[in-house]
């Protein structure tokens, strides 16, 4: 089955989730969560990613971002996920996948959906 295309909608708020491969707890140590966070901040600088909120759990991440320009979200997620996985695998001397297939994106269309996503982030879901 073909993958769905990603859409660019200027000003659109997206809730992004990305799970570790096989739901493993690859982000269980604060060192690994901090590295993911550092790559997030690098993406903000490099691509001008607009981050509203984020949460990093032991086996997945959540991001609330604003789509500001074509490929900003795509390039940012490639940088963050790719570098996090490379560093982890190099440090642990492993070659396995770090992330599940693709990150999942949900469009936040109204204030209620935004509030629900924000509350989930704050509660760690």
Task: Label the model's feature ranges.
Residues 1-125:
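Short catalytic/metal-binding and nucleic-acid-binding patches
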